[in-house]
A protein has these predicted regions:
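Alpha-helical scaffold elements within enzyme catalytic domains, especially in hydrolases
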Residues: 31-34, 58-62, 101-104, 138-142, ...
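Active-site acidic/histidine proton-transfer and metal-coordination neighborhood
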Residues: 3-5, 62-69, 81-177
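Hydrophobic faces of well-ordered beta-strands that scaffold small-molecule active sites
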Residues: 9-16, 40-42, 68-75, 110-112, ...
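Aromatic-lined substrate-binding rim segments of carbohydrate-active enzymes
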Residues: 50-72
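Acidic-and-aromatic substrate-binding clefts and catalytic sites of carbohydrate-active enzymes
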Residues: 18-23, 43-55, 78-91, 118-122, ...
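Alpha-helix N-cap and loop-to-helix initiation/capping positions
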Residues: 27, 50-58, 86-94, 123-134, ...
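Histidine-acidic metal/acid-base catalytic patches
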Residues: 2-10, 26-33, 161-176, 186-327
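Catalytic domains of carbohydrate-active enzymes, especially glycoside hydrolases
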Residues: 24-46, 101-109
Length: 327
């Protein structure tokens, strides 16, 4: 098995990569330790099992015994997002509960999201950003008390880089930062390198995966692929991340499924992107023009758990080689 990455790079696993495993949090930790990573990113509460203090204490003790750092997260904290689950309490109540859990489990951050691409229509996304900023400001004192930072992800096509930057700066970069996802920018017709260049100063943690993008009659198609199989120059992205975000975790979020079509040749598509600068879209177009259709795969199998582990371990091996050659 590959050795651990160099000490100046904290390699991790986002457990969404293993979403079909039906493991306990302790089993997740043991698997990650066997993969010789340093960070385990519990991006959703379901991977922790519960926020019960006894459970969180057990997770913390096992992680410490295995020499692993822990990060935790939740889903939407925007009360007007289509993703938001109000049955779990107000957005503020949910965030405070997560900060308390972060202290118990030893996580320096709480990862959260605004929503998804569905929140861009009818929009405007700026209204959802304002609602999220309001929630964050309402928990500022609690974040200070708990010594926790909130890492907002560019998630599932919800925000472009300049929009997430605005959210962080309006909420307060002293306690709000970014969970930088390398795959999601393409869902917002954005070059991942542009996303990194725009947000690097606010990055607290990350989700890393490779992508393939290519032109088609409607516009472009995007699919997420194992590391090294895409055409977004993921090697350069990783090297740039290590340089611009020193010490920040580089956590694999392996997701491999069929392509998403971005029909930007249809005028209606642009209702979701009325303010996208041409210079930014041009960078996305350049990626698509260099791409070739990605070979079709069996995107879903009877044994999704095995498929997920195979894809993740392929990406981990590639990333370790890349990081070692970079460092």
């Amino acid at each position: 098995m590959d050795a651990r990455p160099p000490s100046n790079v904290k390699l991790g696993i986002d457990l969404f990569s293993l979403r079909s495993q039906k493991w306990t949090p302790i089993q997740f930790l043991e698997y990650c330790a066997a993969q010789k990573v340093q960070v385990v990113h519990f991006s959703e509460i379901r991977f922790l099992g519960s926020l019960n203090p006894e459970n969180l204490s057990a997770v913390r003790k096992r992680a410490e015994r295995l020499g692993l750092e822990v990060e935790i997260g939740t889903k939407s904290i925007c009360p007007t997002s289509k993703m938001f689950d109000g049955t779990a309490g107000t957005a503020e109540e949910q965030l405070i509960k997560m900060m308390e859990a972060a202290n118990l489990v030893g996580s320096p951050i709480v990862r959260a999201v605004l929503g998804s691409a569905d929140d861009r229509i009818p929009g405007p996304i700026e209204a959802r950003i304002e609602d999220t900023v309001r929630v964050l400001r309402n928990v500022r004192s609690q974040a200070a008390d708990h010594k926790i930072k909130i890492a907002i992800e560019n998630h599932a096509g919800d925000m472009q880089a300049r929009e997430l930057k605005m959210l962080v700066e309006e909420a307060g970069p002293d306690f709000v930062g970014v969970c930088l996802d390398s795959g999601n920018p393409l869902w917002t017709i954005e070059d991942p390198h542009l996303t990194l260049e725009t947000l690097h100063q606010y990055v607290l943690t990350s989700h890393l995966r490779d992508s393939a993008v290519w032109k088609m009659p409607q516009g472009a198609a995007v699919t997420w692929v194992p590391m090294g199989r895409g055409n977004v120059d993921i090697d350069s992205y990783v090297r740039k991340y290590i340089e611009l975000c020193p010490g920040r975790p580089l956590s694999l979020e392996s997701i491999v499924f069929g392509p998403r079509v971005l029909a930007y040749n249809d005028h209606a598509f642009w209702k979701a992107y009325p303010n996208t600068p041409a210079r930014e879209f041009q960078r996305f177009l350049a990626l698509a023009e260099r791409g070739q259709p990605y070979p079709a795969e069996p995107w879903k199998t009877p044994d999704e758990g095995t498929r997920e582990r195979k894809a993740l371990e392929e990406s981990l091996a590639y990333t370790k080689r890349l990081v070692n050659s970079t460092s």
